[in-house]
Amino acid sequence: MFFLKAAFCRVFQTGFKLALPVLPYREPTVISSCAELKKVFEAEKLRSVLVVTDKGIVNNGLISPLETVLNENGVNFALYDNTQPNPTVQNVEEALALYNKNRCDGLIAIGGGSAMDCAKALGARVAYPKKSVGQMKGVLRILRRIPTLIAVPTTAGTGSEVTLAAIITDPEKRHKYALMSFPLIPHYAVLDAALTYTLPPHLTATTGMDALTHAVEAYIGRSTTKETRRLALEAVKLIFENVETAYADGKNHKSRENMLVAAYKAGVAFSKSYVGYIHAVAHSLGGRYGTPHGLANAVIMPYVLEAYGQSAYKKLYELSVAAGVCDEKDGHKDGAEKFIAAIKALNAKMGIPEKLSGIKKEDIAVMASNAEKEANPLYPVPRLMTEKELEKFYYRVSDWSK
């Protein structure tokens, strides 16, 4: 039975890879600061926008530059600042009500991936007012253009400012919906390093490792292209060169800027080449317990990479060379092991734990099933795994396991 399922998965993935050149992928127009949004407002004829964010961004004053440019250009705006770390269906519906009440014609998401994912799902609800978030989950379910979406990342990690994905949690079902459609790619991305200066060290670490996960999974998968391989390698190099500095010195402009570039490149890479089991397991943990996505990815990543074994040695070796943690003369296996060891070392240096708390044994089978359904057949992983194999990761990362 597994052989037949595996064959179907590989045929499905090959089909997507062959179709990639003709799929309507686009990248957002990149802007270097909020002050430059004036030309966007004029080009898009925006008169009233909904700003989607969270209370932390508001309390830190990070929306001030945005408010200034909106007021200076006579653009009315309403503020939705109740987005949760793992945005929920309720967040999307609350934001939709505010969008409609204020007769908005555009969206600005400022914050981390949560705000951007919430805004993307909101855009989908505007485009499809009769469909629920759950009805739009999956691949290519959204075909209509969403309202103009401007993404302003204040973290360097999620890559949501360039991706076609939005992850929304349904607390009642304790499950995450993955919406993956080309119209969800933001139309504009503001990459301003100054907006990331106040990001706390722990979030700098976990979002940075999130970006690393994107680059790694995009590179080691079986649906890569010359472009996505190049972008992933460049992202890995930038992250290994800059994330520790950004963690230790939040106002180091160059490291913050390089991390934004790395997150963007990793975002483009995984949008076209997809992710893998690291993300699938992390999403199941987030849906079940609200585990922060970047933290889950960082903790899970070494275990999954080790489990891929020989199927990923060559590509992990190439990433190891790019990261500067092994020599080209090292063998594939040695290089791969050095890369995984370097990831563990990065986690330790930045205070990321080896284990996660709160995982219940009785939940593991359901989470593994959800992860398997998310990953197969879509994610072109180096080696296909069964639900039983995926269950092992939850045991490995649980703080009650040895």
Where on the chain are the PLM-derived regions?
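Short glycine-rich or small-residue beta-strand-to-loop segments that form or flank ligand, phosphate
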Residues: 48-54, 78-81, 107-110, 150, ...
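C-terminal charged capping/lid subdomain of soluble metabolic enzymes
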Residues: 2-9, 316, 326-402
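Carboxylate- and glycine-rich phosphate/diphosphate-binding segment that chelates Mg2+/Mn2+
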Residues: 165-273, 388
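An N-terminal, well-structured beta->alpha segment
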Residues: 1-79, 400-402
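N-terminal small/polar loop signature for handling phosphorylated ligands or for N-terminal nucleophile
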Residues: 58-130, 245-256
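C-terminal catalytic subdomain
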Residues: 273-338, 344
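Glycine/threonine-rich beta-strand-loop-alpha-helix active-site module
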Residues: 90-193
